[in-house]
Design a protein with these regions (language model features):
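Phosphate-handling architecture centered on phosphoinositide signaling
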Residues: 2-179
Length: 179
């Protein structure tokens, strides 16, 4: 009988310790090397929570830009500075992205590519409010520019995890590139 009570007490103590440890790790995820929710909220709010059209300005050496577009399927990063709604991340990496859409745009002799921006590609300390990558999709074969956005919003409203998204007006070296 005594051993049964001791066993129950040990199990109860272990459960209390496990709950306390779990609560601490949830409150302080950086203890395990995780990203705190404050960082996630920062880019969620500042980049994707504006409710409007983002302004994305890309500054890049013109010859590098032309080479990247001419060799889009190589998916090679080039150095650029990216400004999103007034916040600049210098020395970021940018490349054309996609698979079938990249091939289709390339073979159609169009330059309306999707881009992948890696803010930390050349310097791991760089980010956009904690965001290290940004996809700029061209909405290829979507004349409405709405399908992807509405799909993400629909899934999000159903409680399904989806990528954050927003419309963006892209400007490259001071020239409009498109929405």
């Amino acid at each position: 009988m005594k051993s049964s009570k001791a066993f129950n007490a040990a199990v109860a103590a272990a459960l209390v310790a496990a709950v306390a440890l779990t609560a601490c790790l949830m409150a302080f995820p950086q203890l395990l090397g995780g990203q705190s929710s404050a960082v996630a909220e920062t880019y969620e709010e500042k980049v994707f929570g504006t409710g409007g059209v983002l302004s994305v300005e890309i500054s890049v050496k013109e010859s590098d830009w032309e080479t990247m577009l001419a060799n889009a399927t190589a998916e090679e990063y080039i150095v650029c500075d990216v400004t999103v709604d007034g916040y600049t991340v210098s020395t970021a990496g940018i490349r054309c992205k996609g698979n079938s859409s990249l091939s289709s745009v390339f073979s159609s002799d169009s330059e309306r590519y999707s881009f992948k921006v890696e803010f930390d590609h050349y310097d791991s300390s760089r980010s956009l409010y904690g965001l290290d990558k940004l996809a700029l999709n061209d909405c290829y074969a979507d004349a409405t520019y709405m399908k992807e956005y509405l799909s993400y919003e629909m899934f999000r409203s159903l409680g399904i995890a989806t990528p954050l998204c927003a419309f963006a007006n892209i400007i490259v070296n001071g020239e409009p590139w498109g929405l």
